[in-house]
From Swiss-Prot:
Protein name in the entry: Cytochrome c oxidase subunit 6B1
Motif position, Cx10C motif: 54-65
Membrane topology listed for this record: Peripheral membrane protein
Involved pathway(s): Energy metabolism; oxidative phosphorylation
Summary of subunit composition and partner proteins: Component of the cytochrome c oxidase (complex IV, CIV), a multisubunit enzyme composed of 14 subunits. The complex is composed of a catalytic core of 3 subunits MT-CO1, MT-CO2 and MT-CO3, encoded in the mitochondrial DNA, and 11 supernumerary subunits COX4I, COX5A, COX5B, COX6A, COX6B, COX6C, COX7A, COX7B, COX7C, COX8 and NDUFA4, which are encoded in the nuclear genome.
InterPro entries associated with the record: COX6B-like, CX6/COA6-like_sf, Cyt_c_oxidase_su6B
Motif Cx9C motif: chain residues: 30-40
PANTHER family named in the record: CYTOCHROME C OXIDASE SUBUNIT 6B
CDD domains tied to this protein: Cyt_c_Oxidase_VIb
Residues of the CHCH domain: 27-73
Gene3D superfamilies in alphabetical order: Cytochrome c oxidase, subunit VIb
């Protein structure tokens, strides 16, 4: 169990620097990567392509965004009340 956690920590990669968001506050970066992931996933699904190319965006928003925000946004997408353009 402890070895598994050590392996996860060792292999964990955080979000890389994005020059569009140079400030300390990364809220907009979180939001943009969440939108980009869902847009990419929607576009690749429509084309019949492989959605694994969108995985980078998912890793970045999972690294930056609080879990409560992501779950709330996922709920809003499911309800059809999400404010962002996907």
């Amino acid at each position: 169990m402890a070895e598994d956690i050590k392996t996860k920590i060792k292999n964990y990669k955080t979000a890389p620097f994005d020059s569009r968001f140079p400030n300390q506050n990364q809220t907009k970066n979180c939001w943009q990567n969440y939108l980009d992931f869902h847009r990419c996933e929607k576009a690749m699904t429509a084309k019949g392509g492989d959605v694994s190319v969108c995985e980078w965006y998912r890793r970045v928003y999972k690294s930056l965004c609080p879990v409560s925000w992501v779950s709330a946004w996922d709920d809003r997408i499911a309800e059809g009340t999400f404010p962002g353009k996907i």
